[in-house]
């Protein structure tokens, strides 16, 4: 949930490196066919995501304002810690085709990084822009499911990142609750539509083209680290923050790598990729 709040960081990436990505896709894809199982799997993650977004929007904004380099370094570490578990099942499949898929995935994410962005005030929204909010929610949810592409980057491209963050913060205040809901409801509708669409497509690709899919995912994940590092360059570098940043990278790496080791100790689909 917190990963989805930071431009350049993908919630899909965090799902991959913690080992729940394929199960997440399957649960969304078969939500109505296997309702009870899907809800039992998705409910804890849903509660965690909603809680993190509601409580984390202000915290992340404050951390990025006060200690941007350590904060982004922690997320670089989180992402880097998942690379070994992604590399392991594909290490014997380095054909030219797969390498091209990897490079294509990296390139796709970097294209999003260098697209021009804008932002608008929540008070400037026109009636037609609620359709744009729905469309941005749809595309952002597709991006969130796809590892490496940040959903928040989509909102920045549409110019609604600050509008979204203000609306999320406004949910906690009675005076701004209704205004926040008028912004978040069309976004939520778009997110749900995009989520079901994207999960169906990506689940099919993982089943039919597992090796190629994991090369693409690895490319997305590597590129997402480049995106976060690139955004760090916009901040003034200080030696103390740099040292703390390195510590945070190591901390994030160790946490995610430990979680990935727990995941691969269980039977997984990764073992079937050969």
Name the predicted role of every residue range.
Residues 1-4, 10-265:
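Multi-pass membrane proteins that catalyze or facilitate reactions on polyprenyl-/lipid-phosphate substrates
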Residues 262-274:
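Single conserved hydrophobic/aromatic residue that forms the stacking wall/gate
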């Amino acid at each position: 949930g917190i990963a989805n709040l930071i431009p350049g960081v993908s919630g899909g990436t965090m799902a991959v490196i913690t080992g729940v990505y394929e199960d997440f896709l399957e649960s969304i894809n078969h939500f109505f066919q296997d309702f009870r199982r899907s809800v039992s799997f998705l409910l804890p993650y849903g509660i965690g995501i909603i809680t993190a977004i509601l409580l984390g929007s202000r915290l992340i904004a404050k951390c990025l304002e006060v200690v941007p380099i350590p904060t982004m370094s922690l997320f670089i570490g989180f992402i880097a810690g998942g690379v070994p578990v992604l590399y392991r099942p594909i290490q014997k499949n380095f054909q030219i085709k797969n390498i091209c898929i990897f490079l294509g995935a990296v390139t796709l994410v970097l294209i999003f990084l260098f697209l021009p962005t804008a932002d608008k005030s929540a008070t400037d929204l026109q009636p037609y822009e609620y359709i744009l909010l729905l469309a941005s929610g749809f595309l952002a949810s597709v991006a969130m499911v796809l590892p490496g592409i940040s959903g928040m980057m989509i909102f920045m491209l549409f110019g609604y990142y600050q509008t979204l963050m203000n609306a999320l913060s406004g949910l906690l205040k009675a005076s701004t609750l209704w205004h926040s809901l008028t912004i978040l409801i069309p976004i939520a509708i778009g997110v749900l539509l995009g989520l079901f669409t994207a999960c169906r497509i990506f689940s099919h690709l993982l089943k039919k083209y597992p090796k190629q899919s994991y090369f693409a995912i690895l490319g997305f994940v590597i590129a997402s680290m480049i995106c976060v590092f690139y955004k760090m360059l916009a901040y003034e570098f200080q030696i103390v923050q740099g040292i703390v940043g390195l510590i945070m990278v190591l901390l994030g790496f160790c946490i995610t790598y430990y979680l990935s080791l727990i995941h691969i100790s269980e039977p997984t689909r990764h073992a079937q990729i050969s």
